[in-house]
Every structure is written in C-alpha cells, then in structure tokens.
Amino acid sequence: MRTQQEYLIRYKDGNLYCELADIWIDPSKPVKKALITHAHFDHFTFGCEEYISTKETAILLKERVGDNIKIKTFEYGEEFKINGINISFHPSGHILGSSQIRFIFAEEKWLISGD
C-alpha cells in the first residue's frame, strides 16, 4: 500500500499539491505556482507568483486579482508538460472557463474536478 508521500497528487497544508511539478491546485494561500480550476473565490488566492488556467478563467481572475498577475493560459484539451507530467484542462460546465485538470505521468492518470 502506498503512503500519501508516494502519490502524484496529495493533500498538503489543506490543499492539493503535486510535488513532482511543484504545483498547487486551487491553493488557499499564496504559492509559487498555482493551477486554477475556476475563478470562484474559494478556488484561488491573491499573491501567487504564477497562475495557470484556461483563457476564460484568466479573464475572470484578472478582474478579481488585477491585471498585473503572471498567468499562463491553455485551451481545453491542450497538453503542456511540467517535469515530465502531461497536464491538460477539460470542461467541467460549472462556470465560464471552469475545468477539470488531468495529470498523466508514467502509468498514472489523475483527474481533479474542482467543484
């Protein structure tokens, strides 16, 4: 049986964290790099060094956080890599730009739904 430390994504300090990519998912505190499922206030926080989201979510984030944030955007289904992990956003239908986030690494597949 795996320990929590051995999972690709784990619960850490009240948030979801992918240590291999050094990335937090919908963090509740400022972090270096944050993947955002959608722009509701309970799914992002102010002060992250970099945000990663869909283009539509980025528009809403900038309205709420300010235009001076560093944000990378991706289309639904567009894969990008961080430290060998394939990551992509997929529609969730919750609000404009909301997404599920898929992680693929080696034989593991993870899907984070947000809400």
Predicted regions and their residues:
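His/Asp/Glu-rich metal-coordinating catalytic cores
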Residues: 3-10, 15-18, 24-28, 33, ...
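Conserved G/P- and acidic residue-centered "switch" motifs that form tight phosphate/ATP-binding loops
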Residues: 38
